[in-house]
């Protein structure tokens, strides 16, 4: 945050609050490099060291200065309108610079808003994307109906630009951003296709994530207003899970705007038991009341997307299910509410009664089939889950190979240790362990059995299964710690800052 403030103040001293001159500053690309680390579980670093070298950045800025007012030739659509050539290489660097620049004012405004609201400490304490699950465990066991909603996308490019212009008053920068998106991202068509959106998100992940989050923030700000108008209660926990993009100040601004524009009470139904949770482009809406009220909320969503954002959404894509009979997928987990029945014997004087007690418990299950599919895509096993070697890693040393597999196994273990049933997680560990052994045997041109017998690597490879137990035995008292209890209980790791690949595939 301090870096953003320093760079923006430096630009303001030169160009009267304009953002577009920052695209020609070297420190912007250095900041983009420092933030651009791959956080995927299965993939390795994408080679940003070469792309963000000082020589390439200087060459990029020099060529942008040499262009004749960014004139675009209609006869050569493959040329870069900024540089004239090397489109794929330099456009990604520029997109990272755009993402950093456009985030700067929003982060600064968010910082001041958080300081005014005095919630900096509580925000820093929420370090894990698993912070959603305690909310689900507390609330969903008392609810009856759930709706699994996917926020519609793509949205037209011009609508995104117009939404941004409400909050950043820099016309030249947005002309430059519109020019960049139109020619680099193939968003010239009236409605962007899903293929073009997918290509753009892979080539320009940071800029795509910012634009998508800002669109979702705009939609959720309106939804929050509707939610507060439809309930007697004001839920303080409602805003905890929003992306940190100017939400708190925007919420205050919305209250002022709507209080002036609407002098009468909107005729919304009163539903104090509705709960909303979202991560990325997927949200869960749950309620204790009858499906009729959930249906009304569904059509509110549809009309909001169609009328305000010009995004078409079909009513049949939003299903309303009974929570005790259907599971929903969120954050790479399958979750449902399980009914636990128990019989209690009660005695009063000479009479004995049998009382059946039904309690609800939220079950969070590891999705074994999607996980195996992801491992197969990353070439750790086949589609049936049989481990295979990883020949592309055979050039590395034995220590590096084992460390890579252990890192993946550790990330998966930390992410899925909160599951109710861990047999699926142990199967994934077993696949990674055998894949590691086969990779080492392939490197040494030997069979698995001969390699293990010759090198004695069995004890070293036991780290796939024993590392978690050793760490937890240091945290918990030894007299109360047992392996059986560890296997049975759910343990949420609060240092999970990366996103699981399965979350993006939902």
Curated annotation (Swiss-Prot):
It comes from the Eukaryota. GO terms for molecular function: RNA binding. Keywords: Chloroplast, mRNA processing, Plastid, RNA-binding, tRNA processing. It is found in: Plastid, Chloroplast. Transmembrane segments: none annotated. GO terms for cellular component: chloroplast. GO terms for biological process: mRNA processing; RNA splicing; tRNA processing. Its main location: plastid. Usually encoded in the trnK tRNA gene intron. Probably assists in splicing its own and other chloroplast group II introns. Belongs to the intron maturase 2 family. MatK subfamily. This is Maturase K. The lineage of its organism: Eukaryota, Viridiplantae, Streptophyta, Embryophyta, Tracheophyta. The gene is matK.
């Amino acid at each position: 945050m301090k870096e953003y403030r320093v760079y923006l103040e430096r630009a303001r001293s030169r160009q009267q609050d304009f953002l577009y001159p920052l695209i020609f500053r070297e420190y912007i690309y250095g900041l983009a490099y420092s933030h651009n680390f791959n956080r995927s579980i299965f993939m390795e670093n994408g080679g940003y060291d070469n792309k963000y070298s000082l020589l390439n950045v200087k060459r990029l800025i020099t060529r942008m200065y040499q262009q004749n007012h960014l004139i675009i030739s209609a006869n050569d659509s493959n040329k870069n309108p900024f540089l004239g050539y090397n489109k794929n290489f330099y456009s990604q660097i520029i997109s990272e610079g755009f993402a950093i620049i456009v985030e700067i004012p929003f982060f600064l405004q968010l910082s001041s808003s958080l300081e005014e609201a005095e919630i900096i400490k509580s925000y820093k304490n929420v370090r894990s994307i698993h912070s959603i699950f305690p909310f689900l465990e507390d609330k969903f066991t008392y609810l009856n109906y759930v709706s699994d909603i996917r926020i519609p996308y793509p949205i037209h490019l011009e609508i995104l630009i117009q939404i941004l212009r409400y909050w950043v008053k820099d016309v030249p920068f947005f002309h430059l951003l519109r020019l960049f998106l139109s020619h680099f991202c193939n968003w010239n068509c009236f409605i962007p296709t899903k293929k073009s959106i997918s290509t753009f998100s892979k080539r320009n992940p940071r800029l795509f994530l910012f634009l998508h989050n800002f669109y979702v923030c705009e939609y959720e700000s309106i939804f929050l207003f509707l939610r507060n108008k439809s309930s007697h209660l004001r839920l303080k926990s409602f805003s905890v899970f929003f992306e940190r993009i100017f939400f708190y100040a925007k919420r205050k601004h919305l209250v002022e705007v709507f209080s002036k524009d609407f002098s009468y009470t909107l005729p919304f139904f009163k539903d104090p038991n509705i709960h909303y949770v979202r991560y990325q482009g997927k949200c869960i809406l749950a309620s204790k009341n009858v499906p009729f009220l959930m249906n009304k909320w569904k059509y509110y969503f549809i009309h909001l997307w169609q009328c305000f954002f010009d995004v078409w959404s079909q009513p049949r894509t939003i299903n309303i299910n009974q929570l005790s009979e259907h599971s929903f997928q969120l954050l790479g987990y399958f979750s449902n509410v399980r009914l636990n029945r128990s019989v209690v014997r009660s005695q009063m004087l000479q009479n004995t009664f049998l009382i059946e007690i039904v309690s609800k418990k939220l079950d969070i299950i590891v999705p074994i089939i999607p996980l195996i599919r992801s491992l197969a895509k990353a070439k750790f096993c086949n589609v049936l889950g049989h481990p295979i070697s990883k020949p592309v890693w055979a050039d590395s040393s034995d220590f590096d190979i084992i460390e890579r597999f252990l890192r993946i196994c550790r990330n998966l273990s930390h992410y899925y240790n909160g599951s109710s049933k861990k047999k699926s997680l142990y199967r994934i560990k077993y696949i990674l362990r055998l894949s590691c052994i086969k990779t080492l045997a392939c490197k040494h041109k030997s069979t698995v059995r001969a390699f293990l017998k010759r090198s004695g690597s069995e004890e070293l490879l036991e780290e796939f299964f024993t590392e978690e137990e050793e760490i937890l035995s240091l945290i918990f008292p030894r007299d109360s710690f047992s392996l059986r209890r560890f296997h049975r209980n759910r343990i949420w790791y609060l240092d999970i800052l990366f996103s699981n690949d399965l979350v993006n595939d939902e």
